[in-house]
């Protein structure tokens, strides 16, 4: 029996009533649970001898907005952009019938030498998840980062402040609907002789997937494509 097979067996035996999904792919085991079951599941994973997950090595947020789209919706841009070269697809590559946001935890057992990914989806209208900082101290800054970048609140966190963005920053920059150029820029005003904040004056450009067209512009004299 491999380590992953052993882990899956113990998860099914001890946490079947608390998890909604269990998968094993690419050598990694992943479980999903509801928000209200997070703390009971995490306590079992840390304290039960069969698991012994003594380290939280990563925690992050995920935004699944537009996940599975074949291509992006384009808007007017220089020379009409590249939308004319994209064949629109009616269906998505992947269908996700779950809330937009998720929180992902990666656990490591130094005693058992196995790893586990724990995922839970959070309703956009109620982005609140219990903090696990009292179980693993490393969660402190991980949770602050997820709050800063995605706006996910961690109930019970002792110091839930922004971690990476500037003072007074508005919005959460890793959300898929956050503008690439941002909302506010900081610059030096020579007239006022001080640093000021102002709305960005960058004109958004449309970033689109590369489109390869098989027409005469890309065919060499001998009928072969140029490198």
Swiss-Prot record:
Organism of this sequence: Legionella pneumophila (strain Paris)
Enzyme class: translocase
Signal peptide start-end: none
The family this protein is said to belong to: Belongs to the complex I 30 kDa subunit family.
Assembly information from the UniProt record: NDH-1 is composed of 14 different subunits. Subunits NuoB, C, D, E, F, and G constitute the peripheral sector of the complex.
Principal subcellular localization: membrane
Enzyme Commission number(s) of this protein: 7.1.1.-
Subcellular location: Cell inner membrane
One GO MF term: NADH dehydrogenase (ubiquinone) activity
HAMAP family: NDH1_NuoC
Cross-referenced NCBIfam families: NuoC_fam, PRK06074.1-1
Keyword Ubl conjugation (UniProt): no
Domain of life the protein comes from: Bacteria
Annotated coiled-coil segments of the chain: none
Catalysed reactions, as listed in the record: a quinone + NADH + 5 H(+)(in) = a quinol + NAD(+) + 4 H(+)(out)
Protein name per Swiss-Prot or TrEMBL: NADH-quinone oxidoreductase subunit C
Cellular component terms (Gene Ontology): plasma membrane
PROSITE patterns: COMPLEX1_30K (PS00542)
Protein function: NDH-1 shuttles electrons from NADH, via FMN and iron-sulfur (Fe-S) centers, to quinones in the respiratory chain. The immediate electron acceptor for the enzyme in this species is believed to be ubiquinone. Couples the redox reaction to proton translocation (for every two electrons transferred, four hydrogen ions are translocated across the cytoplasmic membrane), and thus conserves the redox energy in a proton gradient.
